Amino acid sequence: MVSWPGLGTRVTVRYRRPAGSMPPLTDAVGRLLAVDPTVRVQTKTGTIVEFSPVDVVALRVLTDAPVRTAAIRALEHAAAAAWPGVERTWLDGWLLRAGHGAVLAANSAVPLDISAHTNTITEISAWYASRDLQPWLAVPDRLLPLPADLAGERREQVLVRDVSTGEPDRSVTLLDHPDDTWLRLYHQRLPLDMATPVIDGELAFGSYLGVAVARAAVTDAPDGTRWVGLSAMRAADEQSATGSAGRQLWEALLGWGAGRGATRGYVRVHDTATSVLAESLGFRLHHHCRYLPAQSVGWDTF
């Protein structure tokens, strides 16, 4: 009996072809999307290969190729366009975003250009201070050299997977603007002018039977990849967040993104519930991001 790895893992699966086929066996190489009731493997071309689990004769787990720094920078460009805040500006390779202090991703400076350097942090701090906002830096892996330990740090994982179109669950409602039900379930104060901005992209606000909500944004990366990013996940309870409600909601939003040309999906996670849901849907680690207060000790000597 085959012992299946987690969904999203790169695999080679050898399976039997229909009786009389020559050769009698063939291989599917790609990302494992499902194992029951049908095995589904997505190849690097995007083709999905399907076959019965009883026809599987061998399985090999493949190592993921190392993520290039350029790929991290490209994804972060797309993610920044998905949460640009209500005010933004470029400063020496940094994108500075402000939005009433709500949602850290839209109230932080991120070093997107290769020219970004820590010697700009004093000016970044002044920009946020002039708006009565805490100056936060969002620093993805390898985009900027940092001191090893800085005070007030918060870490996020950025997880990714391939996406494809599909029929959404009829229990999922998708809107291009958050309604009262969506805002009520979100629980926190999220001004509309914070929730709805996107740079050269499209938004969807999804809800599942009034027990779970999430936001999706389709934006483009400089390398040409079109991404759909999931965020603002809230649910009535943890079971709704990690169970069928969360899965159906996310799948519907990913399918919506694929229908608008997205080929890859991402989500930023910093809590267990979101991580469990993401991994159950085949998301895998791409890189980390660190949020740091700009006044952290060590910037002036680094």
Curated annotation (Swiss-Prot):
GO terms for molecular function: acyltransferase activity. Exhibits stability over a wide range of pH (5.0-9.0). Coiled coil: none annotated. Its EC number is 2.3.1.48. Shows histone acetyl transferase (HAT) activity with recombinant eukaryotic H3 histone expressed in bacteria as substrate and acetyl-CoA as donor. May be involved in survival under stress conditions. Expression in M.smegmatis leads to enhanced growth rate and altered colony morphology, and promotes the survival of bacteria under acidic and nutritive stress conditions. This is Probable histone acetyltransferase Rv0428c.
